[in-house]
Amino acid sequence: MEYKALNINDLPKEFSQKVLEEAPDNPNFPKVSVILTTYNREYFFTESIESLLEQDYPNLEIIVSDDGSSDNTFNIACEYAQENPHIKVVRNTHARGSAGNRNNGLDHASGELIMLLDDDDLLFKEAISQMMNVYLDFDKHYGIIIANCTRSDDGFLSGQGISESREISFQEVLCGCLDGEFLTLFERQLLGQRRFNENLRRGNMGLLWLKLHKNRACYYLHKPLKFYRIHAESLTQNLKYQPLEMVKNYEQDILLFYRDRLKYCPAHLARLCATAALLYRQGGDRKRAFKKILQSLAIHPNLLAIQVFFCLFLPVSCLPKLKIRQRIEK
């Protein structure tokens, strides 16, 4: 079921009121570092950074990490930094791509809490203060706060699987109960030496969130606090379909949390293995596809694994592509 997003101006403001009243200019209030990663998006970047400058949270650091833009994005970012001392602009010195660019931003962040934002998304004015108020109201019990987003194409919430503000268990996230795009705020100390895997081209954010969530409580705020922009450049349908690249993410996901899923949700684990099998088959690797099918069926009988088995005998051109909507990972 999908939930229609409310207008942000109609939402109650009780979550942000404490922040606004107690610490309008208090530098000792927990600093939040927003890492804004960008690459050749001068036409979206300005709107994105303006949404950060309009935030009503009093202690904010903005780290702009540029992945070697060839347009005017970097220069625009530098102009903003000259006018706003809490903005820092850095060039990516890690591997090119979204994972390396995020890691580069993390290297420069000094806040107690971290938020990651893409250069084509916008935050609503009270986004950070509302999430921080949850963090403070519960006396920092929740090291991870997530909120929903409004999709630009249809106005619906981008995050699905939950319909009320409450604590989210590790098992819910592990077993795929939540799906879609969410806005996340998390304690920097949770990272330690952990970083995004720069060898995975796409969709590796979820792996890091699972690692963090396994050892720290998480709270979901059922409000749209980010405008999640859907456009021609943000969907994989406009990319060359690369199943053997996509399957690397599945293999990492399966490997890292195999025992946890085997304990809590074997059916979900079996489906992940079957999906990996389909990707191997689409990439022309029948041998690995067959092994994944056997692994999937050994964990839990499921229809998808059986369907993928019959796909072994079909030409690649006849195989269905996975309907996975995810952002471009360069």
Task: Enumerate the language-model features and the residues they cover.
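Catalytic core of nucleotide-sugar-dependent glycosyltransferases
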Residues: L225-H231, Q237-K263, R286-I299
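A conserved acidic beta->alpha catalytic loop
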Residues: S51, D66-N75, H94, D118
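Short aromatic/hydrophobic "clamp" motif used to bind/position activated sugar donors
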Residues: I114
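Glycine-rich, basic loop-to-helix element that forms the pyrophosphate-binding segment
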Residues: N92-A109
